[in-house]
Swiss-Prot record:
Species, as recorded: Stenotrophomonas maltophilia (strain K279a)
Record text on subunit structure and interactions: Part of the 50S ribosomal subunit. Contacts protein L20.
Keywords: Ribonucleoprotein, Ribosomal protein, RNA-binding, rRNA-binding
Disulfide links within the chain: none
Entry keyword annotation includes Transcription regulation: no
Protein name, entry field: Large ribosomal subunit protein bL21
Gene Ontology MF terms: rRNA binding; structural constituent of ribosome
Amino acid sequence: MYAVLVTGGKQYRVAQGEKLRIEKLEVEVGSEIKFDNILMLGDSDGVKLGDALKGAAVTAKVLSQGRADKVRIIKFRRRKHHMKRQGHRQYYTEIEITGIAG
């Protein structure tokens, strides 16, 4: 069974036992979280579609909180000896899907 859930403005296709990195959530490491905004459920019987399916939920365990690798940004103007360097590290929450109900 798999599901498509929405969190942090992004959609993720998940199955039980998968590990993934999502946008940072303010939760404790080791705690259980529940996602209610499910767009699609699929299994061998077929597919259920809808905007926020009623009764569908995905539960996950929080494995860690961290920061991704640095993304480097360079802006420059040709022939003008002007260059601006910048870097950014995005915060993330790593989760493991423990159950899909629906």
